[in-house]
Curated annotation (Swiss-Prot):
Residues 1-19 form the signal peptide. This is Delta-actitoxin-Aeq2b 2. The keyword tRNA-binding does not apply. It is found in: Secreted; Nematocyst.
């Protein structure tokens, strides 16, 4: 069971880490709340994408052409927007 969890985690990590080479880059990752989304009375739009921090990205943890848009930085990931 532990080996299966490690393999699944590794597969997800590698898929997200190599996502900047993908054509459909905006369709990968998990939606997140950007500061520009703001509080709305009927719920918020999640316009950002959660990116895992890897060595190939800039200091903000976002791929090329994207910028950090969250309220605070995560330890393993950042909320980025194109």
């Amino acid at each position: 069971m532990n080996r299966l969890m490690i393999l699944v985690f590794a597969a997800v990590f590698l898929a997200l880490a190599s996502a900047d080479e993908d054509v459909d880059i905006a369709k990968r990752g998990v939606p997140c709340l950007c500061v520009s989304d703001g509080p709305r009375p009927r719920g918020n739009n999640l316009s950002g994408i959660m990116w895992m921090k890897t060595g190939g990205y800039g200091g903000n943890g976002c791929p090329k052409g994207w910028h950090f848009c969250g309220k605070s930085r995560g330890f393993f990931s950042d909320c980025c927007k194109r």
